Amino acid sequence: MNKKLLVSFVLASLTGISTQAKEKMSSETTQQRPNIILFMVDDMGWQDTSLPFWTQKTHYNEAYETPNMERLAQKGMMFTQAYACNISSATRCSLITGVNNARHRVTNWTLERDKTTDRQSETVQLPDWNYNGVSQVEGTPNTFVGTSFVDLLRQSGYHTIHCGKAHFGSIDTPGENPNHWGFEVNIAGHAAGGLATYLSEKNYGHKRDGQPYSLMAIPGLENYWGTGVFATEALTREAIKALDKAKKYNQPFYLYMSHYAIHIPIDKDMRFYPKYLKKGLTEKEAAYASLIEGMDKSLGDLMDWLDKNDEADNTIIIFMSDNGGLASEPAWRDGELHTQNYPLNSGKGSLYEGGIREIGRAHV
């Protein structure tokens, strides 16, 4: 298969123009089809990397260490003016259906069924929106019904793997489960758009009896409870196990590696946190940097797996974030509010450029 055509197909699903690409894809031969890894980072700003996406390195580019992002960039394309929606659910619903968010109308965070997450206003009457997310089947109110490009991949012979954050549909709706969208394997994906904690010492948000103490508790990682393994690393290990199994199926794979990092809470990844303190970052900023480098290590581990298994030359890797970087949470970031994506204004949740500009790259 033409790899440039397929990467266009996957990228087009973000913009809602995937129909023609789907038709071309279905007409291709089934021999030597490339694997696909879509590596999604949560809340990663355009400067949250040592790789500059501007004409010069910024202060944040100098502060962070992301050698595997640099490694990926050497092998592929960089998109220096990449944009997403300003919040995760809108971007992710567009991704899975190929529909622009102005059409699917998932315009705020989704979580609980039939409950809006809009702030109440005494002066503005807010319009109705699809707060139950998206689905492939009719029957749920305030839901956009669309076709999953993952299901199309599965139907054409791909082994499909979801690992990490989903955030496609509200709790107790069909769309909350990645299996509904054509993923044959679901690792830790559910309705929530965040996480309770990255820490295995807190069982990723579960009590000792196994019950979640938060709607944001990460499911499916029970084998790592109490082991000291950070959530980012646990997800990476499970993804690699799934790839090891996929090798035996004699079919191409699609891995959606959808990290919860670098979403709040900004827990310290102790594999990297001390290094950033020594570099002079504050405790909050060092913790933030540790999440970034932990995610970068995950990217490197997956690339190493491809090299080890002779799949690197037959795998498309697409790297992106779901919205702009965090810039309005003084509990988690130091510095003046709305400046963490400077010279762009504001960040996640805002319609200023800091809220919608993200990092994009692809290895074809």
How should each PLM-predicted stretch be described?
Residues 251-253, 258-259, 294-332:
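Metal-dependent active-site segment of extracytoplasmic phospho-/sulfohydrolases and closely related
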Residues 32-37, 75-80, 155-161, 181-184, ...:
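Loop/turn elements at helix/coil->beta-strand transitions in domains of secreted/extracellular proteins
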Residues 8-16:
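Bacterial N-terminal signal peptides
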Residues 111-159, 166-253, 259-268, 282-283, ...:
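Formylglycine-dependent
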Residues 75, 96, 194-198, 300-308, ...:
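Substrate-binding rim/cap in mid-to-C-terminal beta-strand-loop elements of soluble/periplasmic
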Residues 53, 76-99, 107-114, 162-174, ...:
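Short, solvent-exposed turn/loop segments enriched in Gly/Ser/Thr/Pro and often Arg
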Residues 21, 38-39, 46-147, 152, ...:
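Active-site segment of extracytoplasmic enzymes that catalyze sulfate/phosphate-ester chemistry
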Residues 1-7:
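Bacterial N-terminal signal peptides that target proteins for export
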